[in-house]
Amino acid sequence: MKNVLAVFVVLIFVLGAFGTSGPAEAARDSGTAKSGLYVEKVSGLRKDFIKGVDVSSIIALEESGVAFYNESGKKQDIFKTLKEAGVNYVRVRIWNDPYDANGNGYGGGNNDLEKAIQIGKRATANGMKLLADFHYSDFWADPAKQKAPKAWANLNFEDKKTALYQYTKQSLKAMKAAGIDIGMVQVGNETNGGLAGETDWAKMSQLFNAGSQAVRETDSNILVALHFTNPETSGRYAWIAETLHRHHVDYDVFASSYYPFWHGTLKNLTSVLTSVADTYGKKVMVAETSYTYTAEDGDGHGNTAPKNGQTLNNPVTVQGQANAVRDVIQAVSDVGEAGIGVFYWEPAWIPVGPAHRLEKNKALWETYGSGWATSYAAEYDPEDAGKWFGGSAVDNQALFDFKGRPLPSLHVFQYVDTGTPFKN
């Protein structure tokens, strides 16, 4: 009887600790694994699955005095730290001319070709491939704006198409000459309804093909990706993929942004990507994702999440952040062999200084372009950057803390292969 009672008491304790969902769910909520982080193994994951990050702001951050550290608390090249954490791919955005006539940068990393080459060389030196993300704009290109570069503003369409082809080819030639291991090229960024100032899909398709041609002629082994967003909108991706097919656009990868607080369910993401892959024989991936680990603002510039009205399906904790990344990887893997990878957006865009030092932060953002936009960008983007220029809106979604130390969630990239064991 005593033995039976003892077993009953232990059972009550276990259920009280983990609830009826079991230790896996409890660990997923609290991170009770040996590593301090619980990551469930991703089923069906390809051995060559892309575990990527976009660290486009890194040069500007380092120029602003930001340092990064390894697990032991010693300063270390962030690219080495990323590689050690299981990252195998780096994405970098490329703007044609993100400067005003006096050479003042628009911010957001001031990501021109020179910056891309610096980042690409460091990625290659640490054994990671590069995804070159051409925006074909002088600043941010997204569904709300796809402004042509200043130098192309007065070109007719045929000349613009030629300029896009030549710019792509010359840029890739320079990157290859620098010894960069380019694995993929993105022809446009979140091009839901525009590209380089064009909004007609017949013309957009010709521009896509001009960029694709430049890639094919540079290196036939480089994958060509097209990038879209808002997978939660019913029928959007089916319509885009059919339109690309109808206009005979040459590409390999249909890429999607997926931010959990904006873009619907993971089930839907898998469904719409599977439909594109199965119908048109394309590879698919997530080119951008991220998640919050804290609600704190690190630099005095407001963050994009969390906010009222957003759907946050995981806790705003380091463990919740790891859950979110792991689940996006699973969603893409669930597509099957066509699901090739996931990129985390700006995991190192941490504060250049604490929030209470806002005025000093502003000076660094303006000088080095280490915030999302400078006041100089107003001439090119008056309605957005001109009004809301400032610092990092995603410092609370980084995979490093505000002082540059790696969070446990950074290791989700290596843990998805095996999972993490529980603490004893």
UniProtKB/Swiss-Prot annotation:
The reaction(s) this protein catalyses: The enzyme specifically hydrolyzes (1->4)-beta-D-galactosidic linkages in type I arabinogalactans
Active site feature: 190, 288
GO biological process: pectin catabolic process
Residues reported to bind substrate: 142-145, 229-230, 263, 292, 307, 384
E.C. designation(s): 3.2.1.-, 3.2.1.89
Any one Gene Ontology molecular-function term assigned to this protein's record: metal ion binding
Role: Involved in galactan degradation. Degrades arabinose-free galactan to galactooligosaccharides, producing galactotetraose as the main product along with galactotriose, galactobiose, and galactose. May hydrolyze the beta-1,4-galactan linkages of the galactan portion of arabinogalactan type I, a pectic plant polysaccharide from which most of the arabinose has been removed.
Name the record gives this protein: Endo-beta-1,4-galactanase
Taxonomic source organism: Bacillus licheniformis (strain ATCC 14580 / DSM 13 / JCM 2505 / CCUG 7422 / NBRC 12200 / NCIMB 9375 / NCTC 10341 / NRRL NRS-1264 / Gibson 46)
Gene it is expressed from: ganB
